[in-house]
């Protein structure tokens, strides 16, 4: 096989591999998206179960539990804001919308105590 044919064959193989990698990347993104949605849904269902089990808790404990749940979701790397709820945050990246929600939640709880 001459060098040109070898180069042509190599280029064809590279294009096929590029398509395969792109397909795998798309599949991985879909799996990650579904995983995120399931984690958020799971967390929401756990919160609903907690609410059903603990209807007699004082309001302050409920709000603290809600804040803790939101904080856990956010700390796990997911958005809790209306704009991006449930989507994955980049590592080390903070979202001002999510942080605003957490800040308002904390400040609202402090005002109701005072």
Curated annotation (Swiss-Prot):
- Keyword annotations: Cytoplasm, DNA replication, DNA replication inhibitor, Metal-binding, Zinc
- The reply on keyword Cytoplasm is yes
User: Which sites bind Zn(2+)?
Assistant: 79, 81, 95, 98
Q: Is Plastid among this UniProt entry's keywords?
A: no
Cleavable signal peptide: none
GO biological process annotations for this chain's record? DNA replication
Q: Which GO terms describe its cellular component?
A: nucleoid
> Per UniProt, what is one Pfam family of this protein?
YabA
Which cofactors, if any, are listed as required? Answer: Zn(2+)
Q: How is the cofactor bound here?
A: Binds 1 zinc ion per subunit.
Protein family (similarity comment): Belongs to the YabA family.
Q: So what does this one do? A: Involved in control of chromosome replication initiation. Inhibits the cooperative binding of DnaA to the oriC region, thus negatively regulating initiation of chromosome replication. Inhibits the ability of DnaA-ATP to form a helix on DNA; does not disassemble preformed DnaA-DNA helices. Decreases the residence time of DnaA on the chromosome at its binding sites (oriC, replication forks and promoter-binding sites). Tethers DnaA to the replication machinery via the DNA polymerase beta sliding clamp subunit (dnaN).
Under the subunit heading, UniProt states:
Homotetramer. Interacts with both DnaA and DnaN, acting as a bridge between these two proteins.
What's the protein name? Replication initiation control protein YabA
The protein's organism comes out as Lactobacillus johnsonii (strain CNCM I-12250 / La1 / NCC 533)
